[in-house]
């Protein structure tokens, strides 16, 4: 489920059972891996955590809910953005406001693929300042933060 900052339900996401991934050549079916109900617009996942942020406390941005859960399990406050191309102007404004009002520095471990790197670069560009988001590098054997987290726990 997706909630707004006040905890009101604003949407849901489910796994597409028609999606099939092949480990050969990293190919996948044309069906998307995740689906949103018709008419739903994608937002930042886990917005209620923003009310818990203290001045100067970091916020971790992840690419997808499972990475967000792993980051939360690591003791960090985190949100997930499915894609920079789906990011709404009002969601981007929320992230920008955190930096200006709470001195929140955003942190990100981009997924080890082209879309993950593109999300980080797009966020850095959209936020307007390279210093508003800090990039962390995963070890080379891990595809994303949840993969890394699971290997340690």
Where are the model-predicted features located?
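A generic structural motif
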Residues: 132-143
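Acidic beta-strand-to-loop metal/phosphate-binding motif
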Residues: 61, 104-115
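Short, small/acidic-rich helices and loops at N termini and domain boundaries
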Residues: 146-153
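Intrinsic disorder
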Residues: 22, 100-103, 131-132
């Amino acid at each position: 489920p997706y909630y707004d900052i006040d905890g009101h339900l604003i949407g849901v996401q489910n796994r597409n059972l028609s999606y099939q991934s092949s480990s050969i050549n990293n190919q996948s079916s044309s069906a998307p891996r995740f689906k949103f109900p018709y008419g739903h617009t994608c937002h930042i996942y886990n917005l209620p955590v923003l009310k818990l942020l203290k001045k100067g406390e970091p916020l971790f941005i992840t690419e997808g809910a499972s990475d967000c859960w792993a980051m939360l399990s690591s003791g960090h406050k985190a949100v997930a953005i499915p894609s920079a191309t789906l990011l709404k102007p009002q969601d981007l404004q929320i992230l920008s406001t955190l930096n200006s009002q709470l001195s929140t520095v955003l942190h990100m471990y981009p997924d080890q693929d082209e879309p993950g790197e593109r999300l980080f670069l797009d966020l850095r560009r959209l936020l307007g300042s390279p210093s508003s988001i800090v990039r962390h590098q995963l070890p080379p054997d891990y595809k994303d933060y949840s993969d890394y987290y699971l290997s340690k726990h």
